[in-house]
Swiss-Prot record:
This is Uridine kinase. Pathway: Pyrimidine metabolism; CTP biosynthesis via salvage pathway; CTP from cytidine: step 1/3; Pyrimidine metabolism; UMP biosynthesis via salvage pathway; UMP from uridine: step 1/1. It is found in: Cytoplasm. GO terms for biological process: CTP salvage; UMP salvage.
Amino acid sequence: MNSQQCVIIAIAGASASGKSLIAKTIFDELRRDLGTDQIGVINEDAYYRDQSHLSMDERVLTNYDHPKALDHQLLCTHLQLLKSGEAVDIPCYSYTEHTRIAETLTMTPKKVIILEGILLLTDPKLRALMDASVFMDTPLDICFLRRLTRDVAERGRTMESVISQYKKTVRPMFLQFIEPSKQYADIIVPRGGKNRIATDILKTRIQHLLAK
C-alpha cells in the first residue's frame, strides 16, 4: 500500500448496540500489528453541530437522533484530508453542555480509521468513503436498557430525561433512519459487540484491504 492509502471502516447501529466495544476490540488487536499511531477511531458524536449560540433550554430540545443534528459534511472533509495525508482537528462534544467545547483533538493520517456512530450509513457521501461497513443488529429493548444505564452513570442524565428522549426521538428516529440504513451494511452483526466471529471476519477484511 502507498503511504497515503487509508482504509475506512464504519460501524453503525442503534445507540448502545455494541459499536464502541467492537471498535475498541479491533483497535486494540490491530494496533499490535500496525502500531498505535497507524490506527484511529472517530466517533460520529464529535460531529454534532455547534450549539453555543443557543440557550441550554433550546439545546435540550434538539433531536440528536436526526441526521440534520450532525455535520456530516465536516466529517467527509476530514476523512478526505486524512486519506490525502493531512492531519485534521476533530471537534470535541460535551454531552452535559449539549454543544462543542473549545478543545479539539488532532488526528494524523492513519492506515486504518474506524468510524462509529448511529447515523453513518444514512449519508451517501459518507458511504462513498467507506471501504467496509458494519451494522450492529442488537434488539432495541436491550439497547435501551444499556443506554439508560450508561447515560445516567456517565453523561449526567436523569432516568426521567433518558426515558423521555427515548420515547420522543430515539425510538422513532431509529425506525425512520437507522434501521433502514442496515441495507447499506456489508456485514450485519447480531448479539452485540462480543460477537467474536463477526469481529474476526471484520479484522480479516481490514487486513485484506491493507494488503492490496
